Amino acid sequence: MIDWGYRAQRLAYRAASALGLVQSQTRRPPASKGTAGLRQQVIHFINKPMPGGLPKRTSRALLDVEDKRIVPLIRDPQKAGDDAEAVFYFPGCGSERLFGQVGLATQAMLYEVGSICVLPPGYLCCGYPQTAAGEQEAGQKIITDNRVLFHRVANTLNYLDIRTVVVSCGTCMDQLMQYQFDKIFPGCRLLDIHEYLLEKGVQLDGLSGTRYMYHDPCHTPMKTYQ
């Protein structure tokens, strides 16, 4: 459904471009004292094309770990020995189903730094969309079901002594802060993948003189390091 919606939006963008309706992204918006008219709203919606070329398969499908009866453990045996740090990675809907390349990249980085990446069994939603939409009961049920499942994972893998829960989505971060993970994995903390990589000393080499701009999203995942 999302794929077809994106296709329709990109088609509308191309049609608007041909008609000269698309505005420059650097153009100063006109002054307004009230609600934008329908024409302005439509132009704003199609003024920039939605992304295309989304992954056809999720990272779980690519790694053949979709079975919700198993708890996947991903590690590099050459780097992750018996004393390697284990982290619990919660991908969420966005990083797993919608933009699967984000989830795959996160797992690849954990693999690269020599950590053991523990994934939840099966596809899971954090419950934020339901709660934000006013479906409090549905959202609370998801939270409760997930916490019960995570307790089972913690008990099964207690020998790994998981002390870090990693996320790659700021919205999931906000929701998971309500999960009381310190009572699931005793003594654990909740970190964004970038904060975790910062702790591991991961850097980009050969970028002298290159400047970057970082956009901090509304649901910022940076809760520990500023």
Q: Which positions does each model-derived feature cover?
A:
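Iron-sulfur cluster-binding electron-transfer modules in prokaryotic oxidoreductases
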Residues: M1-Q226
